[in-house]
UniProtKB/Swiss-Prot annotation:
Interacts (via ankyrin repeat region) with LYN (via SH3-domain) in an activation-independent status of LYN. Forms a multiprotein complex with LYN and HCLS1. Interacts with TSN2, VAV1, DBNL and LASP1. It comes from Rattus norvegicus. Pfam families: Ank (PF00023), Ank_2 (PF12796). It comes from the Eukaryota. ANK repeats lie at residues 108-137, 141-170, 174-203, 207-239. This is Ankyrin repeat domain-containing protein 54. The keyword Repeat applies. Residues 140-240 are annotated as: LYN-binding. One of its GO terms (molecular function) is protein-containing complex binding. Keywords: Acetylation, ANK repeat, Cytoplasm, Nucleus, Phosphoprotein, Repeat. A motif (Nuclear localization signal (NLS)) lies at residues 98-116.
Amino acid sequence: MAATGGGAEDESRSGRSSSEGECAVAPEPLAEAGGLFSFADLGAALGSGAGLPGRAVGRAQSPLRYLQVLWQQDVEPRDELRCKIPAGRLRRAARPHRRLGPTGKEVHALKRLRDSANANDIETVQQLLEDGADPCAADDKGRTALHFASCNGNDQIVQLLLDHGADPNQQDGLGNTPLHLAACTNHVPVITTLLRGGARVDALDRAGRTPLHLAKSKLNILQEGHSQCLEAVRLEVKQIIHMLREYLERLGRHEQRERLDDLCTRLQMTSTKEQVDEVTDLLASFTSLSLQMQSMEKR
């Protein structure tokens, strides 16, 4: 009877029922300053199976019970222990598990990002990036949103992707970087943006070509073509000159850059197709010489 009475008295004193289970038990206050929790004491208690030190006789709690209460999340009174894990720490801890594989929603968002970049839809691209879409995610051919934007010549989307961590040197399945695609299509503003964003000017595609090789190929096409009008040819030659100027500026070849400036001035003074062709020939020779110099420097 005494034991029964003592148990009832303990229940009334603690304000709980024994049927509630230990999950609802709040930790009892420490008896004195010397009873503060320490991992050394906890380790000793776990090894011996004894209660935690620093408590009055008859009130020792098991280590497992103490740990259960330590991480209890529904503690409300101010004098009870509060050991909730910060939300930021939980997100960081869950990140590796989330990276194990994208969800269907994430896969759809990444496809929308590439499709929007290909469609020049800058508003959707910006919204998806702000929602956390990975700008480096590629399709089954290795193409990223930056590849599509660079090929289309959309400088604004290119800059937006770079600002959100897109890799300017990421290669697609054929070995092309965004800079290769921009050089092939002569999108000068995109080339400038990619160079400033850290694109490597010496990056090779699978065929071993640099953006300089692609520029020369474009010049060869212009030299062989006869159907384009004067203004169209002049515009393309001007774009190639601007692209090569950025290329040489990145390499620090200031003397060669001055020669390009002279060619650009001469191009602006042309008034006939023959004069434009002459500048094109000079530019092609200049490009070939630059390639030879680059090859000699690598030896």
